Amino acid sequence: RCRRQRQMCIRDRYEPVGYKTYADSDAFSNGIEAQIPVEGSIARGWEPYDYPDTNEGYESAKTTLISPIEDIDANKVNGKELYGIYCAVCHGNKGDGQGILMTREKFLGVPSYADREITPGSIYHVLMYGKNAMGSHAGQVNAKERWQIAQHVMELRNKLIK
């Protein structure tokens, strides 16, 4: 059997009811379709980050935040690629603060990774929130990618301080 509705044929399948998000409904006690998420629930694709966007949060991340990703080639390759996309224009391919925007004097004072004490946790925190003239990259890269970039930045730093 076939039901015709708007020139569409649905054979032997359930035809779902399309609810409007804010429509009235007797399915819930408050009478509306859209419900407030259960306390403690986490949105899909979002990961909690317990360090605040403060100097104290930065220092805490610097000393206590540890990378959960493995030190394997796949992470290194992806970290290097992401660094080239998001970081090298300011920080340079070597991490010396001499990226294309710096050499063209679009920004001044981009730090070299050898200039200060950084850790994977502090790098992750800066990617999450931004710092000084650098904006947050949390919207561009997910948590795993931030850790991969942090891993690559630490490799660059180690080469610079040798």
Q: What residue ranges belong to the model's regions?
A:
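Single conserved hydrophobic/aromatic residue that forms the stacking wall/gate
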Residues: 1-10
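Soluble non-cytosolic domains of exported or imported proteins
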Residues: 73, 77, 117, 140-144
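Electrostatic cytochrome c docking/interface patches
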Residues: 35-82, 158
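Post-signal peptide N-terminal segment of mature Sec-exported envelope proteins
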Residues: 11-30
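The canonical Cys-X-X-Cys-His
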Residues: 79-94, 149-153
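Gly/Gly-Pro-rich "capping" loops immediately C-terminal to redox-active cysteine motifs
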Residues: 76, 80-81, 92, 96-125
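C-terminal capping alpha-helices of c-type cytochrome domains
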Residues: 121, 125-133, 138-162
